[in-house]
Amino acid sequence: MGLTNILAAFIAVSSLFIQSLALNPYAKSNLAVYWGQGAGQNRLSYFCEKTSFDIIVVGFINVFPDQGPAGWPGSNFGNQCADSYYYTKNGTKTKLLDGCYQIKEDLPKCKALGKTILLSLGGGAVHDFYEVKSEESALNFADFLWGAFGPLTPDWTGPRPFGEASVDGFDFDIEKGSNFGYSIMVRRLRELFLQDPLNRYYISAAPQCIMPDKYLSHAISNSAFDFIFIQFYNNPSCSAKRWVTNPKSVTYTVDDWVKYIRKSGNPLAKLFIGLPASKSAAAKEDYLTPGEATKIVSTYMAKYPSTFGGMMVWEATASENNKLGGLPYADIMKEVLLRCDPDPPTSTVTSTISASTSTQTSSQSTTMETKTLSASTTPSSPSTVSPSSTMQTTSTGSTSTGTGTTSSQVTSSTTISTRSASTETVTTRSQEPPSTTISTRPASTETVTTRSQEPPSSTISTRSASTETVTTRSQEPPSSTISTRSASTETSTSSQDSPSTTISTKSAPTGTVTTRSQDLPSTTISTRSPETETETVTTKSQDSPSITLSTRSSSAETVSTRSQHSSSTTISTKSAPTETGTTSEHSTSMPVSTRSASTETVITRSQNSDSQSMTVSTRSPSTESITTRSQGSPSETFSTKSVPVDTISTELPSQTHSTTDSTPVSSSPTIPSGSTTIIPGTASDPVSAPTTTVPPNPTLTLAPSSSTTEDRTTITTIITTSYVTVCPTGFTTVTITYTTTYCPETASLTPTQAPIPGAPAPPPDGWTTIVTVCPQCAPTPTTVTLTVPTRSAFLPAPTETRPVVTVVPVPENPIKNVKPSESGDFVTVTTVAPATVTKTLEYNNPVDSDVNVQPTGGSSPVEFEGGAMTVRSMDVVAKALITAGAAVLGLFLGL
């Protein structure tokens, strides 16, 4: 397969995965929050990781081009950006911030977590007002927003305040000026969205609750918005609090707004009830308790299910500081929404029927009644599921499904949830169904399930496009979980007496078949590959505690079979196109992976009271491998894959080496140049183990060795350090914790240069130095030398603690723009560099799209006085911080 096709397939699979986490715009229980103007606010990534917000609105672009220097817009994101601005080519200083490194880093993390990030225009103006003066200005403003904050394109040469990261759409929170030009901007943005058909973009508005809204009513009536975040506070005549207390005392209600939206430029737009997150976030008398919020949500969600979209909260920091029972206010509101939603995002369609089953000594016969459910979507509404046909099927003995065969005895019960376009689901049930769940969320998906007696719990989740899942269950499997996320995937499963099973497939197009038998405590199968034609077959039998099979390849076929007393086995395939087969009996095993230029090797070792097993697999493109089996004896399996070769994998030492107890088989595969010696064993397992040597010629030598071990100790170091950096108010101290891992197998010596006498010590590994100007660090602008981490130098470990930022208290004054100077003292501080990722989806038109995806976890803008980023005189504080910064830097560099 060509590189272009592989990359295209990878993008498609990635888009499916991210889509599974993304916002469901048709849900009734979405939660939106505004962020960017909170006093002492946490980073954007904090709220993405720690909250259940579905939509986060970043505010604000608070200066419009017609009022901004050089015809540029301006921005304010509180304490999240340095006091540094873009300059035009002719040297004019704009009001557009260019030091938003934290937002650059956090946007990709939020996207990966499935959060929808919108950039808000407007808010409370700092000094006077903002407005769009002409149609040309409106069009140019929309083009600028798309180029600067939309997807990165080669033809855009303007500023990128968030780097390569992009937002998911734009929000209009207009509270000043006039109502002209905004419908023009919305229509222009809709046209620009078509340039990126693989992603889904949204447009929202945040009007005041008084009707008609002075600034946004014209735009809402004449252009297509996806979400309307109505501020039901700060206005007594339409306050949500007053409605809860006395509905007759309110002039403008949710009912009035629903009628208005249904006659607007997009009658399908979703209405969000906007509430303050605390008594201090807006007018104190407009704050609602969770009980009061439940009353208004339950009333209007039930009354207008097609228009009600959820709740908006102003704002994130106020919510974080207002904790009820240990939970932030906004998280409580999310729980309120989910409790009131009669059809929450994880809803299921459940039915159980009796099935006749007969069992004989030589064969089993199962009669199954199958219901076929078809799901269809239209551009104007979410998917619907309706029964379309019923059929009667009878199977005797074994049931053949997909590309593998499974056998089952007596079926049980199943719960199926389907949310997708063009989805076909088939479910079979019979007597005594304790609990089973099947969740499918793909496009063009077919699911077939049969269950048998007494399966306490089983779960199957498929999330993919063009996916076919077939599952059969047999006697007494306490718990089973199958998760498939792929395009064109086929899965079949059956088991007997298997306490727990987990299968996860993530690929496109892929086929997976799994068979289980008695006493299987746990099983995990994971396949991840772009544009693949992968077939995975796993068979297990008695007393096999755990088995893991992972395939990651293009056009790969993997077959793994396990039998009695197999403690743990891991097989990883990463190649294109490949066929692999491995078998082992009475074995425990350990995976070891070695990699070379164009070859990958996986070694699986095992030891048991009655057997030793070792599997070595080297992988390269276009390879075929065959594996033979033997029973009841110490065995060693060696599977090699090269370009291209035919390989026979044998099990040694043994008196019999064949699938049917035939004579021993030897192998002479083609091995890439170079020699490798592999010694099984670990420091904690000093037992006899065979030694395998791979010479540079096509000869394979397997010989037993006595008490040879290999030390595979991995050293993990957690480093906590503090450094001084520059924030909008001057110097600040940042404490970070990161983890480094040293692995003897992969570590390589890095040559170091001897220090030059008298020269300053070089920065530590992963750091570099830059020079910049700090206007607030001293009475006059000061040139400072910053020691900063290089890009992606410290990737966060799973247990990484969040950076703690100490900010010097400052008065609530507007941002002071100070021109850089070349004079001043030199101080060494550090900053954090951004990191980026790319998200790919397959939807575009936010108005009429048939998006059907699972949501994941916002906005009553009030006037802000320059935001949270303010400045004070640093006559006294700066000197102390300079001294402290120099001391910390000296300790850090060992001076």
From Swiss-Prot:
Glycans are attached at N90. It is a lipid-anchor; GPI-anchor. CDD domains: GH18_hevamine_XipI_class_III. Its EC number is 3.2.1.14. Residues 346-425, 479-505, 544-555, 578-589, 658-692, 699-712 have a biased composition (Low complexity). It comes from the Eukaryota. Residues 343-712 are annotated as: Disordered. GO terms for biological process: chitin catabolic process; polysaccharide catabolic process. InterPro entries: Cts1-like, Glyco_hydro18_cat, Glyco_hydro_18_chit_AS, Glycoside_hydrolase_SF, Glycosyl_Hydrlase18_Chitinase. One of its GO terms (cellular component) is plasma membrane. A lipid is attached at G866 (GPI-anchor amidated glycine). The active site is at E175. Residues 867-895 form a propeptide. Keywords: Carbohydrate metabolism, Cell membrane, Chitin degradation, Chitin-binding, Glycoprotein, Glycosidase, GPI-anchor, Hydrolase, Lipoprotein, Membrane, Polysaccharide degradation, Signal. Residues 426-478, 506-543, 556-577, 590-657 have a biased composition (Polar residues). It catalyses: Random endo-hydrolysis of N-acetyl-beta-D-glucosaminide (1->4)-beta-linkages in chitin and chitodextrins. Residues 29-340 form the GH18 domain. It is found in: Cell membrane. GO terms for molecular function: chitin binding; endochitinase activity. Residues 1-22 form the signal peptide. It is an enzyme of class 3 (hydrolase). PANTHER family: ENDOCHITINASE (PTHR45708), ENDOCHITINASE A (PTHR45708:SF47). May be associated with endosporulation. Belongs to the glycosyl hydrolase 18 family. Chitinase class III subfamily. This is Endochitinase 2. It comes from Coccidioides immitis (strain RS).
